[in-house]
Amino acid sequence: MKKIIVYSVLFLMATIQNVSSQTKVLGKWKTIDDDTGAAKSIVEIYESNGKIYGKVLQILEKGKEDKVCEECKGDKKNKPIKGMVIIYGLTKNDDEWDGGKILDPKSGKEYKCVISLENENKLKVRGYVGFSLLGRTQYWTRVKE
């Protein structure tokens, strides 16, 4: 009987930790320009139907607040970047979220995507083609509310 209780408690703790780690990536994140180090936008990471998505809430670059995605394809072509979902379809895989895509609004190109927490306030976002080694990594910072 004691073993059943111990295993039940351990299972419950593992489940709570898994849910807690997933919710830690949720929230608002400030994206940083690779070249200048300046803040570019605020992206909200949210969950829908068990998958992770990211939507541009705000453009921080002066004069680009109303920019459209000129290089995008399909239904995103010439649509405002503000309000656009740029990360979609990520699922939890151990300590990462992968299996989805990220859109670079500057080039209009889509890449495979993997995200993970470096720490409570730093999100590692990697876009790549083919293998994860062939890609680019950005670090986003959590927006304090």
Question: Language-model features: where?
Answer:
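K/E-rich alpha-helical interaction surfaces of small helical-bundle regulatory domains
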Residues: 23-38, 138-145
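Bacterial Sec-dependent N-terminal signal peptides
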Residues: 1-24
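Edge beta-strand at a domain terminus
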Residues: 120-122, 129-145
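Central antiparallel beta-sheet cores of small beta-barrel/beta-sandwich binding domains
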Residues: 33, 38-103, 110-111
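Well-ordered beta-strand positions
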Residues: 46, 91, 116-117, 141
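Short polar/acidic secondary-structure junctions
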Residues: 34-36, 105, 116, 130-131
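Short, hydrophobic/aromatic-rich segments at coil-to-beta transitions
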Residues: 23-28, 93-100, 121-124
